A protein has these predicted regions:
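Metal-ion/cofactor- or nucleotide/acyl-coenzyme-handling active-site neighborhoods
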Residues: 1-260
């Protein structure tokens, strides 16, 4: 089984994600739901999960959400006491008395900021603070019946892109094509198709240190050593790893392959 996994790096702008290829199972991450339908949508951040759920995408299409713990008959009113009104994001309550409650407060954000700043004192303080305070708030999502959301059992605390690749392998893919996995550089502008839009960092944000993403990818390549991974890249991509089951291809060559 072939899987095509879309990351949200800007290199994939040359690729038409709305095209459907019968020989591939498609996987996408986060805001790609705004542009197209994929066979499997992976969403890690709770603000984006709420966006996807409110759009009703999750009622027609298979989704994989992180930490999607459903509470039955739960009253979240007492939790609102720790948040200002502008930081409470609650969807309309439905007849089905089930919800998912997620979020972080300012204290959590400040703790993360202090921890990272102490470890990497040379980082841009303003940029780091924006990253740490992203999505501060209480997110209460009231559920409807017959959605197609599945809670992600494993992996946990990974990025959406690497989680999608791992899930594709779990579901039996023996060939995985990775598009838009451009990694990042903390000294360069952020590389993301959706930067500057709702639930994403501003256009002028800096990138991330990719060390965790690379580690997660290498874990996948080693665990699923019998799977053939094809990293679809642009001309200036520099590989961060060397594994015998990882190959590289330009977008134009993948397009030719898909025409066959």
């Amino acid at each position: 089984m072939k899987a095509m996994v879309y990351g949200n790096g800007e290199s994939r702008k040359v690729w038409d994600v709305t095209k459907r290829y019968e020989s591939f199972i498609t996987w996408g991450c986060n805001a790609i739901h705004r542009d197209c339908v994929v066979d499997n949508l992976v969403v890690i951040d709770y603000a984006m999960q709420q966006e996807v759920y409110q759009s009703e995408y999750a009622f027609s299409n298979k989704c994989h959400f992180a930490d999607w713990a459903i509470l039955d008959g739960f009253d979240p009113e007492f939790m609102k006491e720790n948040f200002s009104s502008e930081n409470i994001f609650e969807t309309p309550k439905t007849d089905w008395d089930k919800c998912v409650v997620q979020g972080k407060d300012n204290a959590d954000a400040e703790s993360n900021y202090a921890r990272i700043h102490n470890k990497f004192p040379g980082m841009d303080e303003k940029d780091l603070r924006i990253k740490c305070y992203k999505d501060v708030g209480l997110y209460i999502t009231w559920l409807g019946q017959k959605d197609r959301v599945e809670d992600i059992d494993f992996p946990r605390n990974w990025s959406a892109g690497t989680t999608a690749i791992h899930l594709a392998c779990q579901e039996g893919a023996d060939e995985v094509y990775m598009l838009g996995f451009d990694l990042s550089n903390s000294n360069k502008p952020i590389n993301n198709v959706y930067k500057g839009t709702d639930h994403y960092l501003p256009n002028d944000s800096k990138g991330f240190n990719p060390v965790n993403w690379i580690s997660q990818l290498e874990t996948i390549f080693d665990e699923f050593h019998e799977v053939k991974f094809t990293w679809v890249v642009n001309n200036d991509f520099i590989s961060p790893t060397s594994r015998n089951n990882v190959h590289y291809m330009f977008y134009k060559d993948l397009d030719k392959l898909c025409q066959v």
